[in-house]
């Protein structure tokens, strides 16, 4: 949410590129699953979440989608992949892995006036969100760390409350983003 506000308010200027890495160590669990170790593997498993983030932050105009790497280190389906694409002239690279022995999430968004950096998720230990203001013509940027904390995973509780609220309102969903994500995967 903090990153979305920074992007909307153009705090880091014109966005040049974004790099996201998301990895966990579930390759052996996936290998034991008949339905998970099939098809595009980690690309549709973890990749769907990364594409959803890109939709939220940058929009849906996906162009020039290319798989840079697709590896089957321990599984029958890909357990590591790197994909690059563009949204609104922003170069985006996403990397996903089931062979990362400590759960890891990193995101770097680089713009003309600075950059924004996310490191980890609170459920996996200390995390932070950092904003760097570009120094011209060059030099060490002015840094501001917004959040640095470690919590138990709050997402399940929040998702459960959100789901109950939707049920009370009799709202049964919108598949628009799911269809966009599905069309992304059909292009690779």
Task: Describe these PLM feature segments.
Residues 46, 155, 177:
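Soluble or luminal CAZymes and related metallo-dependent hydrolases
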Residues 10, 132-134, 165-170:
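Short loop/turn hinge sites at secondary-structure boundaries
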Residues 142-152:
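C-terminal "lid/loop" region of Rossmann-like NAD(P)-dependent oxidoreductases
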Residues 51-125, 155-170:
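Contiguous beta-strand/loop segments that form the cofactor/metal-binding neighborhood of enzyme cores
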Residues 161-188:
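C-terminal helix-rich "cap/oligomerization" subdomain common to oxidoreductases
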Residues 1-74:
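Predominantly a Rossmann-like dinucleotide-binding segment in NAD(P)-dependent oxidoreductases
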Residues 107, 124-140:
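Short polybasic amphipathic segments
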């Amino acid at each position: 949410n903090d990153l979305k506000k920074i992007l909307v308010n153009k705090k880091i200027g014109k966005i040049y590129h974004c790099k996201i890495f998301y990895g966990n160590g579930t390759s052996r669990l996936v290998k034991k699953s008949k339905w998970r170790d099939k098809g595009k593997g980690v690309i549709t498993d973890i990749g769907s979440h990364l594409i959803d983030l890109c939709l939220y932050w940058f929009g849906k105009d996906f162009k020039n989608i290319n798989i840079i790497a697709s590896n089957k280190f321990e599984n029958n389906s890909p357990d590591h992949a790197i994909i690059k694409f563009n949204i609104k002239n922003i170069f985006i690279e996403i990397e996903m892995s089931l062979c990362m022995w400590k759960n890891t999430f990193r995101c770097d968004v680089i713009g003309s006036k600075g950059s924004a950096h996310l490191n980890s998720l609170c459920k996996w230990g200390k995390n932070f969100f950092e904003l760097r203001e570009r120094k011209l013509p060059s030099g060490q940027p002015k840094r501001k760390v917004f959040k640095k904390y470690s919590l138990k995973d709050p997402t399940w509780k929040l998702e459960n409350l959100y789901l109950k609220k939707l049920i009370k309102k009799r709202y049964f969903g919108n598949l628009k983003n799911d269809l966009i994500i599905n069309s992304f995967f059909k292009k690779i």
